[in-house]
């Protein structure tokens, strides 16, 4: 606890505090019939049962508080998860630091040809990487210089800040229960999520494992590395087991085959 885990070029995640562990989950689940903690194996089986069957309230008994430093564009995706409590540094009260996210060269890629909100997997050539990085840094320096000039003229901080870029780093305290944290992690560790927020989610999951290893193991088995099948897809599986054609066609068949091949939700 209190250790900073580096994320991106200047960001971090730090576990400030937590309430409850795996033991709290099993104790709250068993309270209805008065039985306390049993063996680790029995506790693991109970936690696995609860997660598989979506009995969520015992997981809500465990609460984490994180201190996070992250670029504003990542924060704006993060804040879509409204089942948490947070306090963020204010640009109205504080002078924001000249700290901006600059992607590593290997992460600079062209727009995806088949995904309107994503990038291609391959990095652009080295010369273009250098050009993009130089351009980003120059723009960031120029904008921050303008911000500083406005502050020097005693312009209100709440106005001086408005041109600062989405790459500016912000900080917040973020508190969330384990059930809703698992929902956040399931979405933000997924391959469809933007790489930068995925980096934060993966570090957060590693921290979570140190507090609730049994719950995280079940989450990894059923949610992170599992997929859901529709009624039609289940029927297709039955057909394949029986040696028949799947019965699916077109996009439905493509999605079904991709699920089986990749082991992830599509």
Swiss-Prot record:
Locus of motif ThyX motif: 80-90
Cofactor list: FAD
Active site: 188
Origin organism lineage: Bacteria, Pseudomonadati, Spirochaetota, Spirochaetia, Spirochaetales
Binding site for FAD: 57, 80-82, 88, 177-179, 183
Any one Gene Ontology molecular-function term assigned to this protein's record: NADPH binding
Keywords, comma-separated and alphabetical: FAD, Flavoprotein, Methyltransferase, NADP, Nucleotide biosynthesis, Transferase
InterPro entries to which the protein is assigned, alphabetical: Thymidylate_synthase_ThyX, Thymidylate_synthase_ThyX_sf
Job of this protein: Catalyzes the reductive methylation of 2'-deoxyuridine-5'-monophosphate (dUMP) to 2'-deoxythymidine-5'-monophosphate (dTMP) while utilizing 5,10-methylenetetrahydrofolate (mTHF) as the methyl donor, and NADPH and FADH(2) as the reductant.
Binding site for dUMP: 77-80, 88-92, 161, 188
Domain ThyX: 11-222
Protein name per Swiss-Prot or TrEMBL: Flavin-dependent thymidylate synthase
Stated family: Belongs to the thymidylate synthase ThyX family.
Enzyme Commission code(s) on record: 2.1.1.148
SUPFAM superfamilies found in the cross-reference section: Thymidylate synthase-complementing protein Thy1
Catalytic activities: dUMP + (6R)-5,10-methylene-5,6,7,8-tetrahydrofolate + NADPH + H(+) = dTMP + (6S)-5,6,7,8-tetrahydrofolate + NADP(+)
Complex formation: Homotetramer.
Pathway in which this enzyme or protein is active: Pyrimidine metabolism; dTTP biosynthesis
GO biological process, one term: methylation
Cofactor mode of binding and number, as noted: Binds 4 FAD per tetramer. Each FAD binding site is formed by three monomers.
Organism for this UniProt entry: Treponema denticola (strain ATCC 35405 / DSM 14222 / CIP 103919 / JCM 8153 / KCTC 15104)
């Amino acid at each position: 606890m209190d250790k900073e885990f580096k994320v991106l070029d200047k960001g971090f995640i730090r576990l400030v505090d937590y309430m409850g562990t795996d033991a709290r989950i099993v104790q709250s689940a068993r309270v209805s019939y008065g039985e306390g903690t049993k063996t680790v194996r029995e506790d693991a089986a109970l936690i696995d049962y609860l997660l598989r069957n979506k009995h969520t309230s015992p997981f809500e008994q465990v609460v984490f508080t994180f201190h996070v430093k992250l670029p504003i564009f990542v924060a704006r995706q993060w804040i879509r998860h409204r089942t948490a409590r947070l306090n963020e540094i204010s640009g109205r009260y504080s002078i924001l630091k000249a700290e901006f996210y600059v992607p590593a060269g290997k992460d600079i890629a062209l727009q995806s040809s088949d995904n309107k909100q994503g990038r291609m997997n391959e990095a652009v050539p080295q010369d273009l990487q250098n050009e993009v990085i130089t351009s980003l840094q120059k723009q960031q320096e120029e904008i921050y210089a303008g911000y500083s000039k406005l502050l020097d003229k005693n312009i209100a901080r709440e106005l001086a800040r408005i041109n600062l870029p989405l790459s500016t780093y912000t900080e917040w305290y973020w508190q969330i229960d384990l059930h809703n944290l698992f929902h956040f992690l399931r979405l933000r560790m997924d391959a469809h999520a933007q790489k930068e927020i995925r980096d934060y989610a993966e570090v957060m999951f590693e921290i979570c494992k140190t507090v609730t290893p049994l719950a995280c193991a079940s989450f990894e088995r059923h949610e992170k590395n599992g997929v859901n099948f529709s009624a039609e897809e289940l029927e297709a599986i039955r057909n394949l087991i029986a040696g028949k054609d799947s019965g699916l066609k077109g996009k439905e068949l493509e999605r079904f085959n991709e699920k089986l091949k990749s082991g992830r939700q599509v």
